[in-house]
């Protein structure tokens, strides 16, 4: 990066062992040139260079940062190429992007061209599975083995869910064992899905907006609005954390355990060097172990 961006602190937090990152690109954050790799999200790039303060809420000085890292909380909204309110945690970095850290909810650039209207598509599907995590993929395999044709719909760029989160396709894995058992087990499950590719279709980066009467689903996928008439539907959407609000819970640098896990597993970026884990449940111990493996200090 040419010079330090506002709010940037510390060393680069990328974990370079075990993977070869995608092609190096340049993006611009508040007019500062920043190094990124194809496949990284904007949120991962911000975290890697130490920028915890992503925006402030409508109230001045109410600063916000990455929190859930899975697109659920909308706490990390940024403006990308003039388009406001993009979620930094799930928006891929692309060469030449102009990223502006927002004040409040941002305003659209009225001089920019209107996006093309969505194309309406309608089709019939025997079985739709909503969610491409371990449960959804296992259900798809079981159904396909009975001869059913299956469509799996997942909102992420890659299937796998929180447990089997995979690296971006632009990353080359050099040492799978370093990535942990979840990565290895996930690859095994994906291999089973691939063997049944004649029966299983996966739509990534697609959102199910509603399920109506007679099992009709409304799905957005790219620039398409898809109406699906399904004979059967399996809901396997997983879950996300709902933390108890405490004073300071929205401060930059505070995030959910699941959010930290996304950065570690999917982006190979440390959420920090020294971290305090607060809460209960088995996930805390799993994340603590993953943080230690990444060279972080857990206090």
Walk through the language-model features, giving the residues of each:
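Short amphipathic alpha-helical face segments that pack within enzyme cores
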Residues: 41-45, 138, 255-259
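Beta1-alpha1 glycine-rich phosphate/pyrophosphate-binding loop at the start
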Residues: 127-129, 134-188, 271-299
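Conserved short loop/turn motifs at secondary-structure junctions
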Residues: 33, 60-65, 178, 207, ...
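FAD-binding core/adjacent interface of flavoenzyme oxidoreductases
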Residues: 61-62, 82-128, 165, 185-274
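Signature of N-terminal electron-transfer/Fe-S-associated modules in redox systems
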Residues: 1-123
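A short alpha-helix-loop-beta-strand transition element characteristic
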Residues: 52-56, 269-271, 297
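Cysteine-centered iron-sulfur cluster-binding motifs in ferredoxin-type domains/subunits
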Residues: 35-40, 65-74, 129-132, 136-138, ...
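Short helix/loop capping segments that flank catalytic or ligand/cofactor-binding pockets
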Residues: 45, 243-245, 286
